Amino acid sequence: MNSKKQAFMVSAMKSGSGKTLITLGLINIFKRMGKSISIYKTGPDYIDTMYHEKIAGSPSTNLDPYFLEPAFKPGELKRLFFRNFKNDIAIIEGAMGLFDGIYGEGKRCSACSVSEELFVDVIMIVDMDEFDNLFIYLQSFKHRVKAVILNKVGKNADINMIRLKVNEMGLFLIGYLQFDTNFYIESRHLGLYEPQKSIFDIVNNVSDKLSKTLDFTMLENFYVEEPHDTDIYNDKNIHNVDLNIKQNRYRLAFAFDEAFSFTYEENIKVLEEYGFEIVKFSPIHDKVLPDNISVLWLSGGYPELYAKELSSNISMLKSIYNTNIPIIAECGGFIYLHDFFEDGVGNKYPGVELIKGKAFKTKKLVRFGYIEIEAGSESILMKKNQRIRSHEFHYYDSTCNGEYAHAIKANKSKEWDCINASNNIFAGFPHLYLRGYEFLIQNLVSFLERERDV
């Protein structure tokens, strides 16, 4: 194979520099040119990938440097990137600042570490008023930065002079975007603002302006070489998917509506690889669970914004409460399973009543960040002492967080117990990522097989 394909990462010195907006503009520009784009986001963020998908019309893939850290899961990050790189161009949006990774551990698990693992060069998005800080910033660590796109450039800026300064750093200025108060997307905070219809107008305007300044010839020099090893594209070879398991189709009810929308595209793919038929349903709008299902999955989302609608759908609450199939619930789904849960202003609403206690709003993030989880006993997803990597990000807490597993932050600064796991339930605040942790689904299938044989 070993052919070259156009690919680059978009990064910045810090969050709020216009990375997402300019990434969306680039996606839109290439779409207008008739190019197909494979889109990625480093880190665990659900929201920016939603923006990518809105503009591109195709799924965006999370390349998480902690879940798939090479020292912990050798080869997984590279395998994921190339397996999903089926289009003309790959664009990776880096999370936060280029060197922002595990706190106190340098650039570990940063966007920079992803670019180095994949041998992908980086284009920095730099606000004009931050430009003078770029040179010093790039001295911090080794990197693959090759070019700059300037953001919020004033009408009277001397572009030729700026270009010379960029060249003196050993970089190229390949485009710029003039300042415009209309070029703004509300802060997403890893899940506080989903893309609205107005995003299309904003991105089209950005694309119009940016396309007039982009050096398309220079962009063609950003590429990655495909690997010789064709097995990198074949998950069955790597993960030993049991073909006998694939022949046994299980129907999995997957909550997906306004209240529950946070899931990784790779999770759906892994479930399908292991023989699950995904049946999407709405806890808000549907009256009962889908027919003939073997598993219920309640993903993360915004149940607090739809507390009244969820709690007033009594037939759905009863349908979930009375089911005896395995239930997996992450963060928002976990909140929904409580006896009671609060909306965003503290009003209390009835939940499914499978988790005894109350989920309640706090004034700050609770136990947030990357974590490594170790199981204390066997459950529907994990065996004793098995470990997975995960993350938590929530302003809610619970009177019943669970004690099934023990979580330790990535930098080992804090630790706590988490997850309720008994009989057929696996529910807690941690978000689950299945790629590289396929044993979770192998365990689930084994559980279903045992139950079927009883």
Give each language-model segment a name.
Residues 9, 91-93, 123-125, 149, ...:
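Structural motif
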Residues 303-379:
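Cysteine-nucleophile active-site neighborhood
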Residues 2-21, 27-118, 126-144, 156-160:
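ATP-dependent carboxylate-amine ligase catalytic core
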Residues 120, 171, 322-326:
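A short helix->loop->beta-strand "cap" motif at the edges of active sites that frequently abuts
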Residues 53, 245-247, 260-270, 277-279, ...:
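C-terminal and late-domain segments of enzyme folds
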Residues 129-240:
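Internal gly/pro-rich beta-alpha loop/helix module
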Residues 240-322:
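Phosphate-binding active sites in nucleotide-utilizing proteins
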Residues 192-248, 256-260, 421-454:
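Acyltransferase
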